[in-house]
């Protein structure tokens, strides 16, 4: 499963079951307001020595409950899109698309956040909030010592998603910075269904 989908499909509302945690309550308020979202995403993958391994420009669209579109524009074109049933991974340079069944239950934390599947957050993470009049920053620290993450940070400015920062235990960091963000606008369902262009190879693992 592509790393980005395993890490970013879910940030929209929280279950009221966790109302006793003020930090989760506040995150709930911010995420609950998102029904659709579009943004330009600047992605940085940073090595343990601080060097930038990769910098990418991405266009993303999100539509609850299951629609997710993630197109890498530069440097290596790639499209990942799901309607909640199937996932298409289209690589123009290879002239191929791989089709898989999509299972949200197998997605990682950020994916679960973006589509509201947050039932295990309070059980698996310590959540702390730092905020002022303009911004809110949530630090999620895994309770399980075997987690691949050291910490996950989610930042908002003026109630809009600004950044997700994944700090892995191997020292690698992934940063998504959201720009030109638009939310709760009309997005067609057809945006989240990929129609393969003629002449490309189709690897359909969903029917195998």
Question: What residues fall within each predicted segment?
Answer:
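Sec-dependent signal peptide recognition
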Residues: 2-10
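N-terminal signal peptide c-region/cleavage motif recognized by signal peptidases
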Residues: 14-15
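An acidic-aromatic
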Residues: 59-109, 171-174
């Amino acid at each position: 499963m592509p790393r980005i989908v395993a890490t970013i499909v879910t940030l929209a509302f929280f279950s009221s079951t966790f109302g006793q945690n003020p930090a989760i309550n506040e995150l709930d308020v911010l995420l609950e307001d998102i029904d659709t979202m579009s943004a330009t995403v600047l992605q940085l993958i940073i090595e343990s020595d601080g060097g930038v391994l990769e910098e990418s420009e991405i266009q993303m669209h999100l539509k609850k409950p299951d629609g997710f579109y993630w197109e890498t524009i530069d440097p290596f074109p790639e499209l990942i899109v799901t309607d909640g049933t199937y996932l298409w991974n289209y690589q123009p340079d290879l002239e191929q698309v791989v089709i898989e069944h999509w299972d949200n239950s197998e997605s990682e934390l950020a994916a679960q956040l973006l589509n509201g599947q947050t039932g295990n957050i309070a059980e698996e993470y310590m959540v702390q909030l730092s905020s002022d009049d303009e911004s809110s920053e949530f630090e999620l620290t895994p309770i399980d010592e075997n987690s691949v993450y050291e910490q996950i940070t989610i930042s908002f400015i003026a109630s809009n998603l600004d950044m997700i920062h994944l700090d892995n235990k191997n020292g690698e960091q992934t940063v998504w910075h959201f720009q030109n963000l638009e939310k709760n606008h009309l997005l067609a369902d057809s945006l989240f269904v990929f129609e393969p262009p003629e002449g490309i190879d189709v690897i359909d693992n969903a029917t195998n």
